[in-house]
């Protein structure tokens, strides 16, 4: 079975913002290096990442984006003005359902 990763990222230079994203890479380090190379002044930190079926990755990411849409900073970006704990609660619940969202 193929897997993807749904993750939460924070950055000390962006307090109060959480990036909710996904990757089909095999590890988070690759994704975090890629994001750091996009002009962010310090590397992202990953307080949570969850390996899920690749076919569910985008669905789970979309469900999280929808759940936090009122707190979305920019419609074209995956950053939300929320606490990590808020995203963790919903993320863990959605990921544990083992059903298509």
Go through the PLM ranges and name each one:
Residues 1-101:
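Non-catalytic accessory segments flanking enzymatic or RNA/DNA-binding domains
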């Amino acid at each position: 079975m193929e897997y993807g990763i749904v993750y939460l990222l924070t950055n000390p230079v962006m307090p109060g913002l959480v990036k909710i994203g996904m990757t089909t890479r095999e590890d988070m380090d690759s994704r975090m290096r890629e994001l750091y190379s996009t002009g962010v002044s310090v590397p992202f930190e990953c307080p949570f990442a969850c390996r899920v079926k690749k076919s569910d990755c985008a669905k789970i990411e979309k469900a999280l984006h929808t759940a936090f849409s009122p707190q979305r900073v920019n419609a074209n970006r995956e950053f939300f003005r929320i606490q990590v704990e808020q995203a963790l609660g919903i993320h863990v619940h959605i990921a544990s359902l083992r059903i298509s969202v």
